[in-house]
A protein has these predicted regions:
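Short, hydrophobic/amphipathic alpha-helical patches that form generic packing surfaces
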Residues: 36-42, 55-59, 180, 184, ...
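Nuclease catalytic cores
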Residues: 72-80, 84
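Short, charged, low-complexity amphipathic alpha-helix
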Residues: 173-176, 205-273, 326, 348
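A short, surface-exposed helix-loop junction/capping segment
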Residues: 57-72, 244-249, 261
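Extended, charge-rich alpha-helical segments
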Residues: 121, 132, 270-348
Length: 348
């Protein structure tokens, strides 16, 4: 069976699944099975903290049920309209919801855009000038990018009376592949990202088309779809993927490649321990200096006082299972559950 036949059979099966969907979120998740979307790309490229190419493959090959992210979908969809409205007020642009778009020549590459950006209303003859991706984030944590620390959501755009005067593309790196994918599919030259952080702060960014990255995305996406999805061949697994596999006990004899990797890992672990020891010494010295304070500030280059660090007690509510077992032993037994844990890698 050639790839075209496999695609047609696949599409027919997805259509049968759609007929069984009971709500909007299930329908949305099932429609995503028709191809690769922007939110899949970071994982396929190996640049996602949360998912791997193997995770995406399991979903696209029907090994994992769709509709497991309903709460995230419902919450994100509800806030999307709020973020989009504030974007309009800040920028002066007009945004409209958009239908999905299949890339010319690659119908399995599908852009499900949050919004398309117009220079004015459609009634006034407005034209599409860009796209908009709406995001929400609980907090703006620190990350390492190219060896340097920065906020996950960096300095954002600056607007003066709805005019963009300073551009920034310092978005969460997880989403760079997504917006580049959308520009590749649509042919648009820029995509704005609007994010609501902690339900209290809105930031806006502009990302321009990167042809080199888009070519990498295209190559990876086509290969993943044809070689892995349609031919039903799993992509290379990460260690996290391998841990989740349930395998019967069996033994392999180490070859040169395995021995080389194990020895390389040992060398890295030694270096890691040395760094951790050095880090502990620095933290102990720092603790001695700030032990009597809960917050430390500094003055930046602009003369503004900023928070450098906080050192506060955190409250955590947890379930006391031991006390519950002592007071309600029979009820405790009723709720015991035995599960198989992920595989644990140990070295000897």
């Amino acid at each position: 069976m050639d790839l075209q036949d496999k695609q047609e059979r696949r599409n027919a099966y997805i259509q049968s699944l759609l007929e069984k969907c009971k709500n909007e979120s299930d329908t949305f998740a099932t429609l995503r099975l028709y191809g690769i979307g922007g939110s899949d790309m970071a994982a396929i490229l190996g640049r996602s903290k949360w998912h791997t190419a193997y995770d995406i493959w399991k979903v696209k090959t029907f090994r994992q049920p769709v509709g497991e992210e309903k709460l995230c979908f419902d919450t994100g969809h509800a806030l999307e309209e709020v973020v989009a409205k504030w974007y309009e007020k800040t920028t002066g642009y007009v945004v409209y919801e958009a239908d999905h778009l299949q890339m010319q020549g690659y119908p399995f590459l599908i852009g499900n855009f949050d919004r398309l950006v117009y220079d004015k209303t459609i009634e006034d003859g407005g034209k599409i000038i860009g796209g908009l991706e709406c995001k929400t984030a609980n907090e703006n944590t620190k990350i390492i990018v190219n060896g340097e620390e920065r906020s996950k959501w960096g300095k954002d755009n600056v607007y003066d009376n709805k005019k963009l005067v300073v551009e920034s593309d310092l978005i969460d790196p997880e989403y760079m592949a997504q917006v580049q994918f959308y520009m590749m599919v649509s042919g648009l030259e820029w995509w704005d990202v609007a994010v609501m952080i902690g339900n209290r702060e809105l930031r806006y960014y502009r990302v321009h088309a990167d042809r080199e990255l888009q070519q990498e995305i295209l190559n990876k996406a086509v290969s993943f779809w044809n070689d892995n999805v349609l031919n039903d061949v799993a992509p290379a697994l990460t260690m996290n993927d391998a841990r989740s596999l349930q395998i019967e006990d069996n033994t392999a004899t180490a070859d040169e490649s395995i021995m080389s990797l194990v020895n390389k890992r040992k060398d890295i672990v030694v270096k890691q321990k040395a760094i951790e020891e050095e880090l502990k010494l620095v933290e102990d010295e720092l603790a001695e200096k700030i032990k009597d304070y809960t917050k430390v500030t500094y003055t930046n280059d602009e003369g503004k006082v900023k928070t450098l660090l906080t050192f506060k007690s955190m409250n955590r509510t947890s379930f006391d299972s031991k006390s519950f077992e002592a007071k309600h032993p029979e009820l405790y037994k009723d709720f015991l559950k035995t599960t198989t844990s992920s595989r644990v890698l140990r070295f000897y």
